[in-house]
Amino acid sequence: MAHKKVIVLVAGGTGGHLFPAEAVAVELRQRGYDVHLVTDRRAKCFVSCVDEEHTHIVSSATFTRRHPFALIKTCWILLKGMGQSLALFYKLRPVLVGGFGGYPTFPPLLVAALMRCVTFIHEQNAIMGRANRVLAVFVHAIAGGLLSQTGTHAHKTLLIGNPMREVVLKAAKIPYRPSLGEKPFHFLVFGGSQGASFFSRIVPEAIALLNNKIRRRLRIIQQVRGEVVELMKTYRSMGVQAEVAPFFNDMAERMAHAHFILSRAGASSVCEIAVIGRPALLIPYPYALDHDQAANAALLARVGGAQIVSEKDLTAQRLASLLTQACCAPHLLEKQALAAKKVGQPYATRRLADMAEALIAGRSLSDVREEFFDENAV
């Protein structure tokens, strides 16, 4: 009996990095590969599609500009991670190693390149992350989610889109139905892992400024950090129906049933909004490295699929005004939803798996580019 070919996927331990990697892992497993996931300890609460036997934790750390001793410690941890990766790859003998962003991808991808494995990285954002920027020099191909195909590595960059989990693709089949007349208006608010606390402050302030007629229609679903009880009390005192939680396991389904979304502009959020096709107000996280969230949001806003307001400009008064407009202009929201849907890339998972197989087969990048290039991917 022939052994299955091994593919190793590497991702940082947050949902934004892990979810695309998991989506591709499921697709490649269905194609007969033995897929392993390498990540860091933060991943335990996110990993669901890869079993414990196929999940490997490698030491990693983030470079900062702190004390020199901290820098030495970081270098030591990364070297330790390289040693762990070397031992793992000698055991698994992968035919392909792919990275999905975050500093934990650095040791395994660098080791894979030194071992002359076939390698690729996937960059979700419109602006390449710092770890990927270094790794781009060593890998055979770069798969872009929102990435521009210009610059130093344009010759090996393929714009494929961001892989979507099956739950997102299922949610994408639910058509957008505007809230007409006095019907309930579902308002979904989430801030990702960064900046949710800002929404916990600004949203109730804005709701307090709305007239009673609109407030009665609102059905708020809000993802928060640690303000659940306090926020629920605030909404109850205003007579607003709300559901508040630190995490929703069925977020894709909730997005599909939303009439309007308030969100940060991480690559995963932007692409899921596009694939599902929902109108959104995007507030880029102002402290994101290299302002990648602003660039992500601009791609969706450019086609009329979203509105953008900077955090410093989003006052309670402005949000209340935008919410009032949204509730009173259902057909405008429907138009925005259709615009977002047109640029969504629901087949990115399959196409990235196709690219991976093409690389394993030794096909040239020019052949792969011709088959997978799509300038409209979002």
Curated annotation (Swiss-Prot):
The keyword DNA-binding does not apply. Disulfide bonds: none annotated. Its EC number is 2.4.1.227. It comes from the Bacteria. The keyword Cell inner membrane applies. Signal peptide: none annotated. GO terms for cellular component: plasma membrane. GO terms for molecular function: UDP-N-acetyl-D-glucosamine:N-acetylmuramoyl-L-alanyl-D-glutamyl-meso-2,6-diaminopimelyl-D-alanyl-D-alanine-diphosphoundecaprenol 4-beta-N-acetylglucosaminlytransferase activity; undecaprenyldiphospho-muramoylpentapeptide beta-N-acetylglucosaminyltransferase activity. It catalyses: di-trans,octa-cis-undecaprenyl diphospho-N-acetyl-alpha-D-muramoyl-L-alanyl-D-glutamyl-meso-2,6-diaminopimeloyl-D-alanyl-D-alanine + UDP-N-acetyl-alpha-D-glucosamine = di-trans,octa-cis-undecaprenyl diphospho-[N-acetyl-alpha-D-glucosaminyl-(1->4)]-N-acetyl-alpha-D-muramoyl-L-alanyl-D-glutamyl-meso-2,6-diaminopimeloyl-D-alanyl-D-alanine + UDP + H(+). Cell wall formation. Catalyzes the transfer of a GlcNAc subunit on undecaprenyl-pyrophosphoryl-MurNAc-pentapeptide (lipid intermediate I) to form undecaprenyl-pyrophosphoryl-MurNAc-(pentapeptide)GlcNAc (lipid intermediate II). Belongs to the glycosyltransferase 28 family. MurG subfamily. This is UDP-N-acetylglucosamine--N-acetylmuramyl-(pentapeptide) pyrophosphoryl-undecaprenol N-acetylglucosamine transferase. It comes from Bartonella quintana (strain Toulouse) (Rochalimaea quintana). The gene is murG.
